[in-house]
UniProtKB/Swiss-Prot annotation:
Transmembrane segments: 18-38, 53-73, 89-109, 168-188
Gene: tmem205
Compartmental location: Membrane
Domain of life: Eukaryota
PANTHER family membership: TRANSMEMBRANE PROTEIN 205 (PTHR46916:SF2)
Name this polypeptide is given: Transmembrane protein 205
Pfam families assigned to the protein according to its UniProt record, in alphabetical order: DUF4149
Keyword Transferase among UniProt keywords: no
Amino acid sequence: MVAEGDPGNLVKIFHLLVLSASWGMQCWMTFVAGFVLIKGVPRHTFGLVQSKLFPYYNHIVLCCSFISLAIYAAYHPRELLSPSESVQISLFFTSLLVAALQARWFSPVTTKTMFKMHVIEREHSLGQGVGLSANKEGYQLLQEKDPKYKALRKRFMRYHGISSLCNLLCLLCNGANLVYIALLMPTL
């Protein structure tokens, strides 16, 4: 017979720490780090820093998503899930799936495309301006006269957009799961 188990205090604490650490890291990377960097360092330096941070960030989020789902699923058998528990386990699964796509596909493709763009930009003395608005005309002119660069930029924007959506979806799933956990707490 299937029965729900009591995870015990250590498992509960570990689960909450993993989920909240992942969510906090996602908030920092999404809403703080990128905006601070893009306003403070040259564009190519920003891309280089992001290319070094994102693989670690994406794989940590992936691991945290896996751990969160595994712990939750271990103590909530499918046959006994309430409607709200079904939503919660679906959020954990969605977070895991999206984190895997982000870490293993979208982010690496975005980074590879960015580095190909950097090569062409350096040939045209672009990429050393600070901020997104630095030398907009130069980038626009490059797109107009170089079809290869234009295609790379289009590919970069597509994958960067998908990558950003994956990141936001993961952040929202983890945030919603934290809300579920908070609402189930009997007291602070």
